[in-house]
Amino acid sequence: MEKKTLILLTVSVCLAVLTGCAGLRPAPAKILPVTVEVASVERLNAIAAKPPFNPTDVLVFRVNFKLSNPNNVLARVDDLYFEAKVEDGTPEKTIVLASSMPANAILPGGEITWSPTEPLLYGGLLGTFLTRGVGGADGVKGAIRKRDEFWTDLGGDKKKFSIDGNVTTSFPGFPELGTVRNQFATEFTVPTL
C-alpha cells in the first residue's frame, strides 16, 4: 500500500512540475502576419557573354526568403506566393521566377528559410516577348533583338529584380481568429558570379 501511495505521489509531483510550470497560453487577441524578408537573389549558372545563344540555354535563379513569426504562438503559413520580375521596357516586366510555398508552421518567435529555384529558358522568352509586344513595330525581328539584349544583361547581372508577393498567416491552435493576408515588395540586384 505504501509503495502504491509513493508511486502515485511521485507521478502527481512529476505531472505538476511538467504541466504546472508551463501553464496554458492565453488566446492571442489578433494575428500578427508572418514577416517575409528577401535575404538574397542568386544566379546559379553562367551563360555565354554574347549572342548567338542556344534556344535551350537556361539561367537558374534562386530567391532566399527569411520568414519570421512575431507571435507568441505557433503560426502557420497557409500560402506564400511571389513573382520575381525584371524590367524589359514594358510596364508589366518579364517574370523570371514565380513560385508558391506549401503550407508550413513556424514556432513562436521563430524563423524559417525558403529558397525556391527555377530555370528560365532562353527559347521560351521569345513567345513571351512577342505576345506582350516587347519587340515593338519590328515584330519578330524586334522581339528577337530585345530578347538577346535582355538575356545578355540578365546573364551579366545588369538587371534589377522586382519581387512582389503575399503571405497568408493563421494560428492552428486558434482557428476562430481566421487568417491574415499580407503583401510584400522589394527590389534586388543579383550579385555577379
Model-derived regions: residue spans:
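Sec-dependent bacterial lipoprotein signal peptides
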Residues: 1-21
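Hydrophobic core residues within well-ordered beta-strands of beta-rich domains
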Residues: 59-61, 80, 112, 161
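Intrinsically disordered, low-complexity Pro/Gly/Ser/Thr-rich segments with frequent PxxP/GP/PP motifs
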Residues: 88-141
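Terminal connector regions
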Residues: 121-193
